[in-house]
Regions:
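C-terminal capping/gating helix-and-loop segments adjacent to ligand/active sites or protein-protein/ligand interfaces
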Residues: 197, 206, 212-251
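Periplasmic solute-binding protein
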Residues: 1-16, 51-72, 162-169, 234, ...
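Glycine-centered hinge/linker elements that transmit conformational signals in sensory
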Residues: 29-34, 70-104
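Acidic, glycine-anchored loop motifs typical of Ca2+
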Residues: 38-46, 154
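Alpha-to-beta junction loops
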Residues: 115-124, 139
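Short helix-initiation/N-cap motifs at beta->coil->alpha
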Residues: 21-27, 101-115
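Extracytoplasmic/periplasmic substrate-recognition and gating elements
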Residues: 134-206
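Short, solvent-exposed loop/beta-turn-alpha elements that line the ligand-binding surface or hinge
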Residues: 18-20, 66-85, 148-159
């Protein structure tokens, strides 16, 4: 989040609230409502409580609500817990209007809007911080855990989708699966077994945290993963309709 925006509004650090078990969806909504405003009096909202990518928002809200969409052989999209997540997103964009209107013409602009200094909360990561040079911004970037949803709790609050990344599979019935495996292994073994070479540049993300406090938050969140394949199923999810109010969670 943008520390200066919260400080100017007299709002407490969400990390302190999280430590006390008070950083919840309701509290986050309260913050976003307070921080969405017309700052120059021209009648146009120019400060928003939130903006980021919708897929990151879906992932993190479901995990913080103690649930997933596609984490087993049973469909969970229609569950009460996921519905709570979709309702929260719908309300952010169409009821409270605390989220900057979704820009369907420029996907990356939704992730990077915070760079202008008028977004209170956004979804950050080491690679985003590195690409956008967060350390060089004229405001302080503070990382905090996700607020806990109404169906979640501290124990079930997850922050990392462990199914992200590339996975290679060998279908059942393939001739000589061991040969196929060895080909893939050699293809990926660009470091020729030298793990120091493979892992030598993995400290770059420590610098992306900017502060020791942010690094501690990142380390904590990185240890709490959930498994959800919903965004890798090749299905056509009409999320824009939810964001622009054409469709409700129930629909």
């Amino acid at each position: 989040y943008n520390k200066q925006i919260l400080d100017e509004a007299g709002l407490e650090d969400p990390n302190a609230l999280y430590e006390r078990g008070e950083w919840t969806w309701d509290k986050w909504r309260e913050y976003m409502v307070a921080l969405t405003r017309d700052s120059d009096g021209d009648g146009v909202i120019d400060m928003y409580g939130y903006d980021s990518r919708w897929d990151f928002l879906v992932y993190n809200l479901t995990m913080s609500n103690g649930t997933v969409i596609a984490g087993s052989d049973k469909e969970n999209l229609s569950s009460p817990e996921v519905t709570e997540c979709l309702d929260f997103i719908y309300n952010m964009y169409n009821v409270d209007h605390v989220a900057k209107p979704w820009n369907s013409d420029d996907f990356d602009s939704n992730q990077n809007a915070y760079l202008d200094g008028n977004i209170a909360f956004w979804i950050d990561a080491a690679w985003i911080s590195s690409a956008n040079n967060d350390a060089g911004l004229d405001f302080d970037v503070v990382w905090c855990p996700w607020p806990i949803g109404p169906s979640g709790n501290e124990a079930t609050n997850k922050f990392k989708n462990v199914s992200s990344g590339n996975a290679w599979m060998i279908p059942a019935g393939v001739d000589n699966p061991e040969l196929v495996y060895n080909v893939f292994y050699d293809w990926q073994n660009w470091y020729h077994g030298d793990t120091d070479l493979r892992d030598g540049d993995l400290t770059w993300w420590e610098d992306c945290a900017i502060t020791e406090e942010n690094y501690a938050v990142m380390e904590y969140m990185g240890q709490r993963g959930a498994f959800d394949l919903w965004n890798a199923l090749g299905l056509e999810w009409d999320w824009s309709a939810l964001l622009n109010g054409e469709m409700t969670a129930a629909q």
